[in-house]
Amino acid sequence: ATTELLNQPLIVFIDDTTQWNPQNHDGSTGLLTTLREGLRRSLNLISVRVVQELIEPKDIVQNAKDFGMTTYIRAVDAIALGVSEVYPLEITAAYGTIANNGIYSRPLAITRIEDRHGRIIKEFIPESKEVQDEATVYILRDMMKSVVDAGTGGALRWKYKFRAPAAGKTGTTNSKADAW
């Protein structure tokens, strides 16, 4: 959370031959910026530097698998900016893992089947496993709270008056076709 990276222009490799010069959503640059501040402000340049300087793309892919992702995710620098798509249910389960202190629970659509008298015919129990240690997830979740409380997700608080505890990560696709 306190690690600092340079908030300056860089080159991202999308594949072996394609390069891209990403920008922060507001076009800003800066000096050394903490990971917490980069996440709070949704700074693309900081996200890419995490991949280029701290964590290899292949390790991010493995973490994604541990958090329940089954879709193909390309192990390239641009992974930091969402170069690969994932199923909404899988990303929801991944966020659930963060909320659940690092315990991943496989999503279930049906938890039990009852007859017309309420007797249980079949019960389904979600598969759960620890995929990340609680201390690491605590730091991540705390950083994500700053997105909602004082960052790019702040409209949840000031515009919609949502007061319950919340954590999040904002982002948009190119041309703002999707916004999460």
How does the language model describe each region?
Residues 1-3, 70-72, 100-105:
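Secondary-structure transition/capping motifs at alpha-helix termini
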Residues 2-60, 104, 116-146:
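Conserved catalytic neighborhood of penicillin-recognizing serine enzymes
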Residues 4-6, 80, 112:
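Soluble periplasmic/extracytoplasmic beta-strand elements of cell-envelope proteins
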Residues 17-24, 54-93, 107-109:
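Mid-domain, small-residue-enriched loop/turn segments at the edges of structured enzyme/sensor domains
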Residues 47, 80, 167:
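Short catalytic-loop micro-motif centered on adjacent basic/acidic residues
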Residues 87-180:
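A penicillin-recognizing enzyme superfamily signal
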